[in-house]
Amino acid sequence: MVRILHWLIRFYQIAISPMLGPRCRYIPTCSQYSLEAIHTHGAMKGTWLAIHRVCRCHPWGGSGYDPVPPKAIRFISFQQIDSQMLHVTVPFRERLLNLNHSNHLG
């Protein structure tokens, strides 16, 4: 799906946009923003961001630098971490648990 959207936007950039002339009020242009959004966020969210951007690009709208927002960091709960930690093996675990710390006091 991303590939199809990519080529549709590229077709617009190469075939249609030169005939219309520069109209975008933002940097990067709306079509470049759409490409970056789709490649960064995937087809669904990237398309939503592109539509939202094109709707803001009008004579009474904003202008200037408007980059694609970075991909959000996915947070996981402590329960997910605990369940993943069950599968982690520690080398020499038995030796670590059976250390006699009184020998190190001298």
Swiss-Prot record:
- Establish whether keyword ATP-binding is in the entry: no
**Protein name, entry field:** Putative membrane protein insertion efficiency factor
Listed NCBIfam families: membrane protein insertion efficiency factor YidD
Q: Any keyword Flavoprotein?
A: no
Q: Principal place where this protein is found?
A: membrane
Source organism: Acinetobacter baylyi (strain ATCC 33305 / BD413 / ADP1)
Task: List UniProt keywords, sorted A-Z.
Answer: Cell inner membrane, Cell membrane, Membrane
Q: Which GO terms describe its cellular component?
A: plasma membrane
Quote the function comment for this protein: Could be involved in insertion of integral membrane proteins into the membrane.
Question: What membrane topology does this protein have?
Answer: Peripheral membrane protein
**Subcellular locations according to the entry:** Cell inner membrane
Task: Please give the InterPro entries that the UniProt record associates with this protein.
Answer: Membr_insert_effic_factor_YidD
Q: Which family does it belong to?
A: Belongs to the UPF0161 family.
Q: Give the domain of life.
A: Bacteria
Under Pfam families, the record lists: YidD
